[in-house]
Curated annotation (Swiss-Prot):
Similarity comment text for this entry: Belongs to the invertebrate defensin family.
S-S pairs: C21-C42, C28-C51, C32-C53, C37-C56
Tissue specificity statement from the Swiss-Prot or TrEMBL entry: Expressed in hemocytes.
Gene Ontology molecular function: lipid binding
Keyword Metal-binding: no
Protein name as annotated: Hemocyte defensin Cg-Defh2
Subcellular location per the Swiss-Prot or TrEMBL entry: Secreted; Target cell membrane
Length: 60
């Protein structure tokens, strides 16, 4: 189970802490979308303190 959690954390693109977390997951989602990612959420693994972006296209 711990291995799965670590793999999920490594595979997701992490934004900086904050951006609405904790408390405003919509702000986190807006932030992630504004930087070119598909979505964002407050990550439970970090006790909802970090905004995690998913589906990012990568830096060019």
């Amino acid at each position: 189970l711990l291995t799965l959690a670590v793999l999920l954390m490594v595979s997701a693109d992490m934004a900086f802490a904050g951006f609405g977390c904790p408390g405003d997951q919509y702000e986190c989602n807006r932030h992630c979308r504004s930087i070119g990612c598909r979505a964002g959420y407050c990550d439970a693994v970090t006790l909802w303190l970090r905004c995690t972006c998913t589906g990012c296209s990568g830096k060019k």
